[in-house]
Structure formats: C-alpha cells, structure tokens
Design a protein with these regions (language model features):
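Polytopic alpha-helical membrane proteins, predominantly small-molecule transporters/carriers
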Residues: 1-106
Length: 106
C-alpha cells in the first residue's frame, strides 16, 4: 500500500509543478487553489508512505516521479524543448527509480 501512496504522491507532485506554471506565480485564483491542494495532498501521501518505506527511498522516488512527469508534461503541454540530453537525463532518472524500488524490501 505504501508504494501505491508514493506513486499517487509523485503524480500529485507533477500536478502541482505544472500548476505553478498555470497559476502564473499564484496570481490566478483557481490554478493557485489547485496547485496548493495538490501540494498538500502530495506531501501528506509522501508522509504516509514514509511511515513504512525508508525515507531516502521514498523521497528519491517521489522526486523522480515528479521530475520525469514534469519534464514529460512540459514537453507535451507547454512546448518545452526536446533534445537528446534531456531524454537521456530522464532515462537515467527512471533507471534510478527502478533501482531504488528493486533495492528496497517492502
């Protein structure tokens, strides 16, 4: 169950990171409300997952999911640049996430 909570927390991190862009520095009300709500839920779920998972693993995977998802949505929704270095970097993050999962009992 902790892994499921962690994945949801990571996806919510992607949501609030993209929400930061749409809130335009918290100057737009509804995108700001959604961003703050996603932040709170993401951190709460991370904390819940960290009750049973090692904090180093939980935090690293949370950040990794957030990073990979934010890069992907930045490309897909915001027209951010796609280049070989970005794709290789994201692939390395994914390898790190998988390695941490495999190295963590639970």
């Amino acid at each position: 169950m902790a892994w499921i909570l962690l994945i949801i927390a990571g996806l919510l991190e992607v949501g609030w990171a993209i929400g930061l862009k749409y809130s335009e520095g918290f100057s737009r009300f509804w995108p700001s409300v959604g961003t703050v709500a996603a932040m709170i839920m993401s951190l709460w779920l991370l904390g819940s997952a960290a009750k049973t998972l090692p904090i180093g693993t939980a935090y690293s995977i949370w950040v990794g999911i957030g990073s990979v998802g934010t890069v992907a949505l930045g490309i897909a929704l915001l027209g951010e640049e796609v280049n070989a270095m970005r794709l290789i970097s994201v692939a390395l993050i994914v390898v790190g996430i998988i390695s941490l999962k495999l190295a963590t009992p639970a």
